[in-house]
């Protein structure tokens, strides 16, 4: 399974990696400009540098290369669920991440 995380925050990366207990290829990017390959799952932080996570989801959703990728927005608060739905994310996870909810993304 190919997993990409777009975030500029180290603790978000660490919290995702500590719960992945299966075989995977992981790519960590600090911005959406660096995304070149297709992935099974693309996790996007709510805020990355000066770019909002919802706009990154919208941007990569326009590229057919990512049509089969599951795009998951990592939200800061429950109120951000609206943003995830509005931009067409395939799912969302509330930070800090927990194992139970992360596992639901993969099932």
What name fits each language-model region?
Residues 43-60:
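Conserved phosphotransfer microenvironments
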